[in-house]
Amino acid sequence: MEFVTLTEEEFREFSMKHPMANFMQTTDLGDLKSNNGIKIDYVGVKEKGKLLCATLLEEEPSILGKKVFYAPRGFLIDYHNKELLKFFTDNLKTYIKKRKGFKLTIDPNLVYQVRGADGSIMPKSQKDDESFKNLCDLGFEHFGFNLYLEARQVRFAYRMMLDEPYDVKKQEFSKSTRKNLESTYKKGLSVRKGVEKDLPIMEDLFKDTATRKDFFYRKLDYYKEMYKYMKDLMTIYFAYLDPKKYLECAKENLKEEQEKNKEIVNKMEKDMIGAKLKSQKEASDKRLIKLENELKEAEEFKKNYPEGKDIACLLSMWNGEEFLTLTSGSLEKYRKFTPKYAMYDAHIKDAYKNGYKACNFYGISGNFEKENNPLYGVYEFKRGFGGNVIEYIGEFTLPITKFNKFYNFLRGIKRMIKK
């Protein structure tokens, strides 16, 4: 076996076809990072000319002229092949040491175990303890089985396997999810795909959500660069409110309820008014008031936005055999349209169309209790589409030199001072 540096072309060909392929281990992301001043390396192991494993490495400057190295969602390797893993790790240590690096961090795109939809450990689920042990035996230090967002990458995600036709899978959506989808489309909402000129709209929607929820968000320049280098991996969805369609749906919905209300009145005139009929009339009257107000809102919307308006956005990514929902944003004012459901539905349909094996709805927390859990709503929404919780193996750090201990000592002092 031979440890080698790789050209972008060699790495691209290998990484796009690997079983653990993901968007973080692509030359597309490497080019984006390079453009932002981060040194990118591509290395691997060959035997008789055949590439056996590889990884993208980020070089990050640290203190005193030293560097730390990071392989985001790497390596692309069979973690059960201990001989190959050891050879690669040993040579990486030498490679990194020569470049003044003192530690390497990895967070493999490796599922540690599949859990039930409710987060419970399933009886037949097997933990990938072999991969975990192989890494630890080689000196990798595990960050821990964290439940939240303490590490660089998410450790829990929600995944929907596309092993049955869409119409069958849709029956596995929760009742509330199916109801919200139906309601969303009945309100005149549609989904369109974005292009480069739509990036300012996307940034505004992400900013609105991030500001509302006190999240970090990236500026427009970042998304322009991201689109430049990663557009072949990206799909941008917009939930679009068309004024004409919105108004037509509002009129139709009101008309349907008026007819239902009239039928109830006719029954009340012919029959004795029972509690059930009276309750139906009261509920219908309330819906009529609501729908009349919605019609006024639709008329006002058409007046203010004759060209329509994008009210939500979803950014999805190629992730090997998965189609991944990376991030989303929406306008609070139009929350009642539940636009996220329509965008996720479009994402799922495209995943089927393009031959993906799964939809990865990405980050959730590992706390599945509703009480005192601010992230529960994210999990509950994604769970509504059916599927399972997946638990990644987590983050590992490999100390390269003794300087790592000194570095950790300084960080400890810094944390103490902050307290």
Where do the protein language model's features map onto the residues?
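C-terminal catalytic domain of photolyase/cryptochrome flavoproteins
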Residues: R12, Y42, K302-K303, I364-K419
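Alpha-helical structural motif
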Residues: T7-E10, F88, K127, S131, ...
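A short, hydrophobic/aromatic-rich structural module that often spans a beta strand
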Residues: G119-E130, A151-K169, E332, T401-K419
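A conserved beta-strand-loop-helix scaffold within acyl/acetyltransferase catalytic domains
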Residues: F3-K48, L52-L64, Q113, G139-A151, ...
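Short amphipathic alpha-helical segments
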Residues: K67-R73, F156, K187-L189
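Residue-level detector of family-conserved "landmark" positions at structurally sensitive sites
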Residues: I106, F145, G194, L220, ...
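Acyl-donor binding region in acyl/amide transferases
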Residues: K66-E150, K309-I311, M317-F385
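Short secondary-structure boundary/hinge segments and terminal tails
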Residues: V114, R152-Q153, M202, E369, ...
